[in-house]
């Protein structure tokens, strides 16, 4: 079969591109075009696509239009959820702590989810510090009366902090004074199954972190160990983050694809018998998702687990595991579940890195003459170099755009 262009070799890539285009359009037109309008457009285009089964070209166009409208509808719906009306006045509410409380001067900062409002609200909270606030842990319930406000930007800041909070699910911010709250047992039944599961996972992770402290880890050693193994970066100091960022190794502290990939590779070596391939892949994926649950089901870890799951299923079909289609399937699954991930820096960087490895790894590998490249030690070093350079080609523009810097030590750091 002939194809009129290389892109037709990657059908899922086209679906992903139209879905992304729809998400971008839906976000830009939010407020001007309603979710109902996007839903109607999705339904109509899907109906015509089903009716046009005898006209392949027309049906293909209509399917892509359906993906476009679907992306717009999904992002519109998610924006509706985070753009809830906030009272803007002192409000009484019950909530549960859903992030590791962090001491910052005279306040303790943490995330709360309300459990007695019409819809649960995720709140970025600052609690005036006292002995009770210092003892707050993930999963603790509180009853409070405080001013709930929509996220706003800091005066004179270039970074759009309000947009960042909204796109990460925060509905409001609040400051809680000493006499405005008390600990309480709260009912979590109004929360979704996913929210309750995540809270349970975070409570379990908190117990594991306490084990690290009991074993004698403290200071920077504890902070790095907690970040690399359980994804808790709350103890990392700004100085330590800066050192890792300058050295080009900040990705080591962000529990994501690198760490899950190592776990997947080790488990694959342990379960390498070919005749038990299906069983071994199921066991490996169960282990991966169990780990995702233990570390709190953060966005970056879930994203990486989805990519590994797609990779695993593709390997069972004896297809090219690391291809544009595989990457596109992962993108479609993730964005269909949470379209605002598209605006997450971690999402953009992880997919850019994998995309450029797929595109540039082989050409970079062949830059070195085969007679030299086939020497075992040189081959291994050059393969690592090619992967690192290809990934950096993809993420360098994003790093420069978002952080205004680029590490020149990435090759040496990644080798180590």
Where are the regions that the model predicts?
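N-terminal leader/targeting segments
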Residues: 1-84, 173-176, 196, 200, ...
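Membrane-interface helix/helix-cap signal primarily in integral membrane proteins
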Residues: 2-5, 64, 68-251
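Hydrophobic alpha-helical transmembrane segments in multi-pass membrane proteins
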Residues: 14, 22, 55-61, 174, ...
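Alpha-helix C-terminal capping segments
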Residues: 49-52, 84-87, 112, 212, ...
């Amino acid at each position: 079969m002939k194809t009129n262009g290389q892109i037709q070799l990657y059908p899922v890539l086209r679906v992903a591109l139209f879905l992304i285009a729809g998400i971008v359009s839906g976000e830009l037109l939010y407020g001007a075009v309603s979710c109902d309008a996007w839903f109607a457009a999705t339904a109509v285009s899907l109906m015509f696509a089903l009716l046009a089964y005898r006209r392949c070209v027309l049906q293909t166009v209509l399917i892509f239009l359906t993906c476009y409208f679907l992306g717009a509808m999904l992002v519109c719906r998610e924006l509706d959820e985070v753009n809830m009306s906030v009272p803007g006045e002192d409000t009484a509410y019950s909530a549960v702590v859903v992030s590791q409380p962090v001491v910052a001067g005279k306040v303790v900062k943490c995330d709360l989810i309300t459990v007695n409002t019409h819809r649960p609200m995720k709140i970025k909270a600052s609690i005036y510090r006292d002995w009770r606030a210092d003892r707050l842990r993930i999963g603790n319930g509180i009853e409070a009366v405080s001013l709930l406000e929509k996220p706003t930007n800091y005066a004179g800041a270039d970074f759009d902090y309000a947009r960042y909070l909204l796109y990460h699910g925060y509905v409001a911010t609040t400051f809680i004074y000493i006499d405005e709250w008390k600990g309480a047992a709260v009912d979590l039944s109004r929360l979704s199954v996913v929210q309750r599961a995540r809270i349970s996972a975070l409570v379990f992770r908190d117990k594991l972190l306490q084990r690290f402290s009991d074993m004698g880890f403290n200071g920077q050693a504890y902070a790095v160990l907690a970040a690399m193994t359980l994804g808790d970066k709350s103890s990392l100091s700004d100085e330590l983050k800066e050192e890792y960022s300058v050295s080009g190794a900040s990705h080591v502290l962000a529990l994501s694809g690198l760490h899950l990939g190592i776990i997947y590779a080790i488990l694959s070596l342990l379960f390498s018998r070919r005749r038990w391939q299906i069983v071994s892949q199921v066991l490996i994926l169960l282990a991966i998702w169990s780990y995702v649950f233990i570390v709190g089901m953060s966005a970056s870890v879930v994203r990486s687990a989805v990519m590994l799951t797609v990779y695993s299923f593709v390997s069972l079909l004896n297809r090219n595991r690391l291809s544009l289609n595989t990457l596109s399937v992962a993108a479609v699954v993730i964005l269909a579940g949470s379209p605002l991930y598209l605006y997450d820096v971690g999402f953009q960087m992880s997919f850019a890195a994998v995309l450029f490895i797929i595109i540039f790894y082989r050409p970079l590998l062949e830059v070195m003459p085969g007679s030299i490249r086939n020497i075992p030690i040189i081959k291994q070093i050059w393969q690592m170099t090619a992967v690192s350079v290809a990934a950096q080609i993809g993420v360098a523009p994003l790093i420069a755009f978002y952080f205004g810097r680029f590490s020149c030590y990435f090759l040496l750091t990644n080798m180590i």
